[in-house]
């Protein structure tokens, strides 16, 4: 799965479920938690409204 496919998968997962932790996304997408964090940061910087709360996850 390339970066674009992974970022799209993150968006789709966040739309399906209200809140997801980075660890859950990493397991689902078979990648590292750090990669998920970088992808979420890139999505946020490009204007995608992703809310992250430490200890609670992303929505």
Which residue stretches match the model-derived regions?
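Short, basic/aromatic recognition patches that contact phosphate-bearing ligands
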Residues: 1-59
């Amino acid at each position: 799965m390339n970066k674009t496919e992974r970022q799209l998968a993150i968006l789709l997962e966040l739309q399906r479920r209200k809140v997801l932790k980075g660890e859950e996304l990493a397991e689902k997408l078979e990648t590292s938690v750090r990669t998920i964090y970088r992808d979420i940061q890139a999505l946020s910087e490009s204007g995608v409204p992703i809310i992250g709360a430490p200890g609670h996850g992303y929505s």
